[in-house]
Amino acid sequence: MPVTVDEIRALAASLPRSYEAHVRGLVKFRVGQIVFLSIAPDGSRMGCGFPKEFRQAAVDAEPEKFALPSASDMRFNWIHVSLAAIDADEMRDLVEGAWSMVVPKFLAEQYAHEQGYARD
């Protein structure tokens, strides 16, 4: 079942140090001044932090789900995701993964442990 913008916003807002900002009609989530998530005005897709070294493989493997960012944004760790093509678990993985790229490592590890993701 596709995810909704409200589900994405709720998860992103719940992450430590995350806050919502509005820039040129886009809903963005930041930690400090670093954007880790952006939602298209029409709610059809999101852009999120994603490791550059895995980006092309993700697009090649699932082109209905992932798309490369614009040429000017290729220098960033970023990918576009079709919301109609992902479920709640995939959305959670993508949003939490993007967030974990921009927070201090200790905070990402603490969050993972609290969520039951980390090994003891």
Predicted regions and their residues:
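Charge-dense, helix-prone N-terminal extensions
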Residues: 1-120
